[in-house]
């Protein structure tokens, strides 16, 4: 039986719903979905330059889980950029505390 999901503190909201290559209609693109917690990990780790320990504490998760989320998010972004896929960003109405 899988472990129950923990509540995670999310403070960042994506300004757009999707990023895609210019000139290609989105209906023709393969899409990669990035989760809200992966998006938050990218923001804290790469944009705000927080250490993994501090970023994990701010999200309310372990450092190892934060590392997994960050690696997964980076892979999805790199795949979308290098292979010309659309990147679907998370859209959430409540970014203070979300059950993921």
Curated annotation (Swiss-Prot):
Q: Enumerate the Pfam families for this protein.
A: DUF134
Q: Which InterPro entries match?
A: UPF0251
Chain segments annotated as transmembrane: none
HAMAP family reported for this sequence: UPF0251
Note the PANTHER family from the entry: PTHR37478, UPF0251 PROTEIN TK0562
What the record says about family reads: Belongs to the UPF0251 family.
What name goes with this protein? UPF0251 protein swp_0615
- What organism is listed for this UniProt entry? Shewanella piezotolerans (strain WP3 / JCM 13877)
Source lineage: Bacteria, Pseudomonadati, Pseudomonadota, Gammaproteobacteria, Alteromonadales
């Amino acid at each position: 039986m899988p472990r129950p999901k923990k509540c995670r503190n999310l403070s960042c909201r994506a300004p757009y719903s999707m990023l895609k290559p210019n000139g290609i209609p989105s209906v023709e693109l393969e899409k990669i979905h990035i989760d809200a917690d992966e998006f938050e990990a990218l923001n804290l780790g790469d944009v705000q330059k927080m250490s993994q320990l501090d970023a994990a504490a701010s999200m309310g998760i372990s450092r190892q889980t934060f590392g997994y989320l960050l690696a997964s998010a980076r892979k999805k972004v790199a795949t979308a950029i290098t292979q010309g896929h659309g990147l679907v960003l998370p859209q959430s109405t409540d970014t203070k505390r979300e059950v993921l």
